[in-house]
């Protein structure tokens, strides 16, 4: 039996942080499905923190969905995207371990996140698409000379979507050691910089593993391999699954633990 799929414990030492951006009725459906998937496998005692990043509030509606043990934070920092999950986790400390996800991530089976490491990306990716003109200035903002050198190495991987499992102890360490996430909250303000953030978190994870003598890994492996293994068997390319229409129209393997839907935001 896989360690993360063992018998459900009586108590849970983690919660979920979901970054939400609603810009139309189609994207309003995504976060609700993500919430329903969480509640299908995790009881109401598991808290969900939703960080709303500059949504158009006229589209944010859920008349048929009751939110239980859920806190919604309206961020005062628009367009920061996934960085907000780490910023508010550090600021609010809603639980001791966070599962950081997008509003377009749908969990399809129970995973005992409490048994996992204090820091682990959900997905990794190879660095074939690095943009040093964006990423190096972000690294320098963290004011750690060693990171500048490590960035040039080929040893570390990107953290797809900046999604991870991370403990409060770890996020506090990253803030004290590397000024992450607070130093970047005034810097990350575009899609390109949010893509750079995927590399920054991967770089910090690499450093964390070295300091703690931990082997680097990600929970679901390389995102490109994951897409091909779990989606393509049914005759369509996973990158083409947009919004709820495509999600509902396609079949997935029963063993697929998590599904990512694309929303082009």
Q: Which residues does each PLM region occupy?
A:
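ER/Golgi luminal nucleotide-sugar-dependent glycosyltransferases, focusing on the catalytic module
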Residues: 1-265
